[in-house]
């Protein structure tokens, strides 16, 4: 679960960076 959460956070961060 921890690894899954970390991956999810990284994906969200990457998406946010792409938007900006």
Curated annotation (Swiss-Prot):
Q: Which UniProt keywords apply?
A: Chloroplast, Membrane, Photosynthesis, Photosystem I, Plastid, Thylakoid, Transmembrane, Transmembrane helix
Q: How does it sit in the membrane?
A: Multi-pass membrane protein
GO CC annotation: what is one? photosystem I
TM segments? 2-20
The GO biological-process annotations, alphabetized, read as: photosynthesis
Q: Where in the cell is it found?
A: Plastid, Chloroplast thylakoid membrane
Q: Which family does it belong to?
A: Belongs to the PsaG/PsaK family.
Q: What is this protein called?
A: Photosystem I reaction center subunit psaK, chloroplastic
- Protein species of origin: Pisum sativum
Q: Gene name on record?
A: PSAK
């Amino acid at each position: 679960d921890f690894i899954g959460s970390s991956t999810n956070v990284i994906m969200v961060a990457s998406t946010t960076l792409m938007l900006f």
